[in-house]
Amino acid sequence: MTMSAEINLPFNTFTRAVATTCALIGCTLAMQSSHAGWFGATTTNSKDKLTLATWNLEWLMTPQARQALGATCMAQQPRSDQRALPCTPGRTPPPERTAADFDALARSAQALRQRDSVDVVALQEVDGPEAAKQVFRQGWRLDCFVQRQHPQKVGFAIRDGIPYRCNGDLQALDVDGGTRSGADVTLWPGTRQEVRLLAVHLKSGCFTGKLDRDFPPCAKLRQQVPVVEAWVDQRVREGVAFALLGDFNRHLDKDARYPAGPDEAAPFNLIQAWSDHNPPGAELLRATEGERYIGCDADDRHKQYIDDILIDRRLADRNANRRFARLSYEARDQGRTLSDHCPVIWSLRP
């Protein structure tokens, strides 16, 4: 476990005035959002707010690591205990980024901190703290990454000054030695603001349809669902506010319409398995519910979110005003090697 040495709670308030934003980021970042409950200025004490984000950074590595691993890549996807990259014939290799690419990603990270006052970002496909530093350059603690040799790791970027505790990996999510563990952190431990977060990057490939169909990715995802449910149920029993953040590799808007089925160990769908009121209080609210899809850039052809943030009833009850946003990439960076995902943000206020 890791405990932040910083025990004060300096919550900075950043103006949203256009002039200040221009000075910080050049007036080109494209923030698109839809709002529920509040918009613009507020008198809410900043200590009572919480802003969560999740961002899959698509094979984010240092240039040195990318070069070294690319020279000895494997024909198949490496397992969790293998320090290697795939070079599967017929598939696009992990990206190689230039300094300008990293700078563009860093501008998005800067906007998350300075303009949107994000407190914590759940990270996926990041090769640990050194890789994360390529993007999250100032004002963040990069920590609680899962213990995995594979370059695709899950972890957190936590705003400087927020006390936290790393709770260790949710290793059971790696159901076959090749899927990804979950990263688990507690913010403001031991205070009335305490909230526990689980960052996930679930098995890819089973985006829609029941999990019991004869398709290997669905079988793996089906094994992961009870692991998350057990984590959720334990937090409910403890009476701790919590959230799930990450890349679910699932169209949760469709998934949520259908029942989980009678067998908790072999569910048909995700959302109703986790949000089943068993134990009482096991109820989750989803950031993207009812939100139109906002593309990451002009080339984004997706229609639905797979990145999402889910909060429990306790956290929802103390934050009735919630704002969803998606941080799209700058138009001037069209064509750069950034990521096939961009940040999803959920701001919570009383």
Give a label for each model feature.
Residues H35-N45, A230-A243, N249-P350:
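Metal-dependent phosphoester-hydrolase catalytic domains
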Residues A19-A30:
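Bacterial N-terminal signal peptides
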Residues A199-P217:
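Active-site His/acidic residue clusters
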Residues E58, D127, H201-K203, F248-H251:
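Catalytic metal-binding/acid-base residues of hydrolase active sites
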